[in-house]
């Protein structure tokens, strides 16, 4: 009898692991990859990235893919286990399979073309949802030939790609589709309420009835979930269900203002400061926002009405993609962390260059940010800004794969890197 119970327990454990693995790979809200029973691919021999880039002690970095035909931006792993990446400027999606499991992509396969500035990607129910400059589409392989030729429009209720043209999407834990759209300007009062905002749709592109402005007289306002977010290139949900977004602040106030807002606790129906206000201070912050004096506040509106950030970085750091470290190959001490890809500065003075890097933001026991430290550095040429031609690379996105390794896209060096822990 006891042998029968052992068999039942083993089967149940195996079923649980397989079930969690499939859920992680198929997409959804915030994807948290749980530990797998399969062995991770081996670490390839040291290459240019391994020799040039500095990674935190106990980790190694290698090139996963290089010589991409255009600038790689945001990434997502598909239900097939392969990495997909948007090539924004060429209007393409590339697939990077590692069929021989050696830790490097075997080839670069263009699986979709003729898209309009594709950026954010997320898989759901066998479809790849793509955030384009002025629309959301979903793609799949309808005939089994490996290309994503079947295409459906979800919504074109997205502002035109003027100014900040990247669009990012994620499905939330509520099953709704969230889309970030940046501003059309450095600082201004936007005519279109969908700009400098996070929008919220049903999966079919319709407006949820519980959106804060679902019945507004201006139909453009109906998809708005939160606003005052000048350029939130990425966002995610914490295990506790809180929505966090990053935010690229305005230029023109010197090297030190305004700080980049890295962790903004986004609240539905709320204003988050831009263009009138910003969160002061660097690091952990707790005070109200302060005014950008270049633009007058509307009558009756004050900066203490804005939702402030909880954690900031030096001005002009340019935070782009971000991800949480739970359920990865990383040692336990590195899992309770937020990882952020910084594009780095292009317009600061020589003594105040902001580095292009991947940074680790440490979270406390209740999941709140408390400190930051470099995780991957060495992309920038000494003394040169990240926008300089001598720059080796500029991180754009950071995600974890189904085997628990970290992947970093580099839209300057046209590479994807893979980071794993080492003994």
Regions found by a protein language model. Give the residues of each.
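A detector of repeated loop/turn-to-beta-strand junctions in beta-rich toroidal repeat architectures
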Residues: 90, 105, 133, 148, ...
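Residue position within the beta-strands of beta-propeller blades
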Residues: 84-86, 130, 178-180, 245-247, ...
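Generic structural signal for coil-to-beta-strand starts
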Residues: 82, 127-128, 135, 176-178, ...
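Hydrophobic core register within WD40 beta-propeller blades
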Residues: 75, 121, 169, 232-235, ...
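Asp-box/WD-like beta-propeller blade repeats and closely related beta-sheet repeat scaffolds
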Residues: 134-171, 182-184
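Structural WD40 beta-propeller signal
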Residues: 78, 124, 172-174, 238, ...
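Acidic, glycine-anchored loop motifs typical of Ca2+
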Residues: 101-107, 142-147
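Beta-propeller domain segments
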Residues: 42-57, 70, 166, 184-188, ...
């Amino acid at each position: 009898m006891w042998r029968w119970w052992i068999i039942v327990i083993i089967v149940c454990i195996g079923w649980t692991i397989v079930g969690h693995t499939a859920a992680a790979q198929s997409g959804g809200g915030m994807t948290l990859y749980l530990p797998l029973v399969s062995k991770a691919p081996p670490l390839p021999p040291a290459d240019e990235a391994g020799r040039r880039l500095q990674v935190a002690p106990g980790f190694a970095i290698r090139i996963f893919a290089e010589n991409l035909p255009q600038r790689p931006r945001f990434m997502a792993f598909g239900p097939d286990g392969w990495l997909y990446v948007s090539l924004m400027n060429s209007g393409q999606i590339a697939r990077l399979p590692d069929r021989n499991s050696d830790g490097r992509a075997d080839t670069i396969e263009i699986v979709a073309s003729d898209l309009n500035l594709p950026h954010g990607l997320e898989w759901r129910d066998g479809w790849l949802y793509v955030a384009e400059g002025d629309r959301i589409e979903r793609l799949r392989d309808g005939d089994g030939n490996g290309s994503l030729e079947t295409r459906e429009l979800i919504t074109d209720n997205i502002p035109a790609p003027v100014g900040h043209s990247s669009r990012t999407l994620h499905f939330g834990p509520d099953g709704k589709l969230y889309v970030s759209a940046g501003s059309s300007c450095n600082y201004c009062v936007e005519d279109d309420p969908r700009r400098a905002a996070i929008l919220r749709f049903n999966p079919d592109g319709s407006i949820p009835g519980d959106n804060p402005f679902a019945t507004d007289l201006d139909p453009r306002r109906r998809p708005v979930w939160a606003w005052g977010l000048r350029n939130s290139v990425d966002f995610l949900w914490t295990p506790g269900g809180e929505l966090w977004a990053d935010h690229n602040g305005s230029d023109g106030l010197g090297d030190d203002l305004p700080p980049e807002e890295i962790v903004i606790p986004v609240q539905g129906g709320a204003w988050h400061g831009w263009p009138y206000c910003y969160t002061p201070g660097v690091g952990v912050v707790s005070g109200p926002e302060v005014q950008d004096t270049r633009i007058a506040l509307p009558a009756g509106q004050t900066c203490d009405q804005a939702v402030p950030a909880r954690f900031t970085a030096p001005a002009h750091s340019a935070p782009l993609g971000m991800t949480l470290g739970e359920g990865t190959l990383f040692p336990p001490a590195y899992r309770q962390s937020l990882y952020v890809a910084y594009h780095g500065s292009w317009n600061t003075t020589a003594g105040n260059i902001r580095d292009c890097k991947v940074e680790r933001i440490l979270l406390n026991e209740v999941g709140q940010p408390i400190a930051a430290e470099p995780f991957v550095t060495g992309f920038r040429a000494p003394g040169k800004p990240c926008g300089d031609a001598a720059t080796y690379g500029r991180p754009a996105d950071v995600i974890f794969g189904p085997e628990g390794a970290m992947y970093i896209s580099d839209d300057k060096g046209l590479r994807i890197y893979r980071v794993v822990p080492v003994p």
